[in-house]
Amino acid sequence: MTRLPDPVPATDALPQAGRRTFLTRAGTGAGALAAGALLAGNATAQPQRDHAPASAGAPGAGPFWPDGIRLVISISMQFEAGGQPPKGTDSPFPKIDFPASMPSDPATNTWFAYGYREGIPRMLDLWDRHGVKVTSHMIGEAVQRHPELAREIVARGHEAAGHGPRWSSQYAMTRAQERAFLSESVTMVEAVTGQRPVGYNCNWLRRGPNTLSLLQELGYLYHIDDLSRDEPFIEQVNGRDFVVVPYTLRNNDILLVEGRNYSPSAFLEQIKLDFDQLYEEAGTRRRMMSISAHDRISGTPQMVRAWDAFLRYAKQHPGVAFLRKDEIARYTAASPLSVREQETI
């Protein structure tokens, strides 16, 4: 795994301050250098540039990323196929209340099966072509049902992160139930991949009042269930630091579940617009762009073409790096320049 250099000194830093309707409302609207090459020394990244003074109120003003990196891009590849409930989950098909005599929804399950049969293998080849490393949020049951695929993800240099042992709403659990749930998630992923997860993503980002403290107790370094910033930051959980590497709804392929009023072309245009704005802001502010790819959605032929076009586009810009979320979290935890939120939501 490529590692970021030690955090830059703080001498020049500014003083630090002490699925469907839901996503349709939140997300509709509307290339990059690989971190491995960029940070290993054989990249085309430009030397560190002088940063223009940031306004006093600008979040995270001042230089942040090392080695001439201007903008970090963080990709989530959700490995959920095989971990979904047998019936009743979101899909392109109309909702049906199946009778008890119908134990599963075959049509929806074939849609999910595309994720592990075609989607992830196709995306892995795409990341390889561009030298991009991603973070794969893995449902434990999906990993157990398709262990070879989970191991292949890690073998190609990607991060295995937690996404629950199964598709469940953990916010409704007692503390003891949720602790067992989270522990099981760690065990299932580590047993198959050999990599112990240090990052976590709740189902639909819906965490409960005990989730963060439990993650911290279990040795997690970061979570992503937060949409409040375009950069990583630190919040306090039980008086101790816990890193947030924010997720995204706007740059999220889940909007394509229904296939109406949205398309791969719209997705491409949206992430390019997002990139352009964040790249511009990154001249004076620390910036991170998040993008989400689900196995059965972004792994389709037309979506891989859209992703490929975006990667080629971003490669035209100097100082852009794709980093795994564990890399981002470790750098954020160690850097004196990291934003420290006084509010923990």
Each PLM stretch: what is its role?
Residues 100-104, 121-124, 128-209, 232, ...:
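Metal-dependent polysaccharide deacetylase catalytic core of the NodB/CE4 family, i.e.
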Residues 55-58, 222, 272-345:
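C-terminal domain-boundary segment and adjacent tail
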Residues 51-67, 187-284, 339-341:
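Active-site-adjacent pocket scaffolds in enzyme catalytic domains
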Residues 78, 127, 215, 245, ...:
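Conserved, mostly hydrophobic/aromatic
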Residues 1-21:
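N-terminal secretory signal peptides
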Residues 46-48:
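Boundary of Sec targeting at the N-terminus
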Residues 15, 21-43:
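N-terminal export signals
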Residues 53-111:
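N-terminal regions that are enriched for targeting/export leaders
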